[in-house]
Regions:
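Short, hydrophobic/aromatic beta-strand segments
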Residues: 59-67, 79-81
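Positively charged n-region of N-terminal signal peptides that target proteins for export
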Residues: 1-4
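Conserved aromatic beta-strand anchor motif in extracellular beta-sandwich/beta-rich domains
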Residues: 70-72
């Protein structure tokens, strides 16, 4: 589960990077990651926070209006949204907190199946707003990004 959460975090930052033609975005790199907290909100929803070490060779930027859906075999599995996160210039630890809830088509048994997590089974829709420190802003959306491809970024 920790790995899936970190993959989604990388997906958010990678999506932000793809939204600009800035050559330095391709030089973003990710290091250690972990879960800061997970708190059940109900049987079908959790709140939590994750951290990841990021090396950002360009100006800092804010990722906001973060929303997404995880699909398992093409069927909506989890819906989520997260608070704004700032990725500073240089190296540092970025923390993102948010809420995730099972979609109506998912069962609690599906959550137990995460024990045998296979990234080939999952894809992600993400939408974010990116604001560079210089003030330039762009909204970027991607649909059905394979989780297996996001794994290659970690």
């Amino acid at each position: 589960m920790k790995r899936l959460i970190a993959i989604l975090f990388v997906g958010i930052v990678a999506l932000a990077a793809s939204g600009f033609c800035h050559a330095q975005f391709s030089k973003l790199s990710f290091g250690k990651y972990g879960v800061s907290s997970i708190r059940p909100e109900s049987l079908r929803a959790v709140r939590g926070a994750v951290w990841i070490d990021v090396t950002n060779p360009m100006e800092g930027f804010t990722v906001s209006e973060i929303k997404g859906t995880v699909y398992k075999h093409g069927v909506a599995f989890v819906h989520g949204e997260a608070s704004d996160v700032y990725i500073p210039s240089g190296s540092g630890r970025a923390v993102i907190s948010g809420r995730a809830s099972l979609s109506s088509s998912a069962s609690l048994w599906d959550v137990l199946a995460l024990i045998a997590f296979d990234p080939e089974d999952y894809s992600v829709d993400l939408s974010v707003r990116i604001t560079l420190d210089s003030g330039e802003t762009r909204v970027v959306s991607k649909t059905r990004m394979p989780v297996a491809a996001l794994l290659k970024l970690i």
